[in-house]
């Protein structure tokens, strides 16, 4: 990923755009084919150092790039950058970089999805307590948590694919988008050679709503990774201790406390998500430019677009690493579930009473009285319910307190995950 966003790669993409434009001019009979052939044979991407040296004088990076190459081409150099404006080269070159970087991110999402899916299947039946508002709710399985992550990553993959398609455009329409010095056919031919579509209506630049959508999509994928990492952090707390990220031999968790085993990588992912999210705001700020363009977006984009790709690429790699090596403590999950004194059975008792004809609020208050007592006195909720003659006289409590009731549809949910993995039928993620 760093290579895609290097200065060397940027200049190589700019040259690729220039050469595609020259090929198109030759095909249209505007620039001699012999001159284009000579330019192709001689032109090489200039070094970033050479461009910087020239830019110190001309104060324009694209002009410095053009001068660095044209100055080495001899008489044919007059055709280099023919009919183009800087943004023709910069925006179209950026589209090439984005497509390459996007494919790397899609690969990273695929690896993360694979890791999550494998661990989800492994822990399909690993029982744990579900928590809402941070408080014990009802039983679920650890595999179901991960299955949800797999589908969220799939939605991220689909969004990124769409955003990349939205960025698969180039423009060679000149200073204000009117083709005054170029030709729509030039743009069509050159973009086709580059694997891009012409921007339907451009100004001096490609409209920045495309870039904002891309950055927002990267931020949304980062937010998903943050959500997953935050869950791992919560499960790693001493009071919970249901999961832990990998901890290597010789690793130290603290400079002062030898006992510490902190979820530092998960914390790092949460921090980087904030950076990617903030960058999306910059992308939105860049949409509104003066008239046919100003250059206020340029300095910001040179930071936020590469940084967002680099950060998310790292986040996906480290998240997959965490999941692949995640220590899952099934016995601790069971103990934490049992520590709730069976309070999670409250809805089962409530509905069973309603089924007997008892008015819902009366049933709710009756069950709640036992739940509060179990909580305050640390007594077993099922025992208190069984001791209530009114409840015991109305319903058969054995099936009500069947733990397997909560996981009876797990196989059905995992069939959806299997379908997603097979890609044999459409699944709405």
Please name every model-derived segment.
Residues 1-173, 179, 184-189, 198, ...:
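A helix-coil-helix interface module used to build multimeric assemblies
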Residues 29, 269, 312, 363:
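Residue-level signal for inorganic ion chemistry
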Residues 31, 36, 240-241, 359:
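Conserved hydrophobic residue
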Residues 121-143, 243-254, 259-260, 291-300, ...:
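Glycine-rich cofactor-pocket loops
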Residues 187-204, 208:
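Active-site-adjacent "gating/activation" loops or surface patches in catalytic cores
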Residues 207-310:
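A conserved active-site cap/scaffold subdomain adjacent to cofactor or substrate pockets
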Residues 275-358, 366:
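Long, amphipathic alpha-helical stalk/connector segments used for oligomerization, subunit docking
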Residues 342-393:
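C-terminal hydrophobic structural anchor segments
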């Amino acid at each position: 990923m760093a290579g895609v966003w290097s200065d060397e790669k940027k200049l190589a993409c700019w040259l690729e755009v220039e050469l595609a434009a020259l090929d198109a001019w030759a095909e249209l009979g505007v620039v001699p084919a012999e001159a284009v052939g000579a330019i192709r044979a001689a032109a090489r991407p200039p070094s970033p150092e050479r461009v910087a040296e020239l830019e110190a004088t001309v104060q324009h990076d694209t002009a410095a790039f053009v001068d660095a190459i044209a100055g080495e081409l001899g008489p044919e150099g007059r055709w280099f950058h023919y009919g183009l404006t800087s943004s023709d080269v910069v925006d179209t070159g950026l589209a090439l970089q984005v497509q390459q970087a996007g494919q790397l991110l899609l690969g990273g999402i695929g690896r993360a999805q694979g890791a999550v899916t494998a661990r989800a299947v492994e822990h399909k039946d690993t029982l744990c307590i579900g928590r809402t508002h941070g408080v014990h709710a009802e039983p679920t399985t650890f595999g179901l948590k991960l299955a949800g992550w797999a589908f969220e990553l799939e939605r991220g993959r689909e969004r990124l694919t769409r955003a990349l398609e939205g960025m698969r455009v180039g423009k060679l329409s000149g200073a204000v988008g009117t083709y005054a010095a170029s030709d729509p056919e030039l743009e069509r031919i050159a973009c086709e050679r580059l694997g891009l579509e012409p921007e339907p209506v451009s100004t001096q630049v490609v409209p920045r709503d495309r870039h904002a959508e891309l950055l927002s999509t990267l931020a949304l994928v980062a937010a998903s990774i943050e959500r997953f990492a935050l869950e791992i952090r919560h499960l790693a707390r001493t009071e919970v201790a249901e999961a832990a990220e990998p901890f290597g031999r010789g690793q130290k968790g603290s400079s002062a406390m030898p006992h510490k085993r902190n979820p530092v990588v998960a914390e790092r992912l949460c921090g980087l998500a904030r950076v990617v999210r903030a960058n999306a705001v910059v992308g939105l700020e860049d949409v509104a430019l003066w008239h046919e363009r100003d250059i206020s977006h340029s300095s910001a984009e040179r930071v936020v677009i590469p940084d967002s790709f680099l950060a998310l690429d790292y986040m996906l790699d480290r998240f997959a690493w965490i999941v692949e090596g995640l220590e899952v403590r099934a016995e601790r999950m069971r103990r934490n579930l049992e520590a709730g004194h069976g309070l999670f059975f409250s809805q089962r008792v409530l509905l069973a009473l309603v089924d007997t004809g008892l008015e819902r609020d009366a049933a709710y208050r009756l069950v709640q009285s036992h739940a509060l007592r179990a909580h305050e006195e640390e007594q077993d909720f099922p025992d208190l319910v069984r001791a209530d003659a009114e409840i015991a006289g109305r319903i058969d409590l054995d099936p009500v307190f069947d733990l397997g009731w909560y996981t009876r549809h797990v196989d059905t949910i995992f069939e959806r995950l299997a379908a997603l993995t097979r890609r044999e039928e459409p699944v709405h993620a």
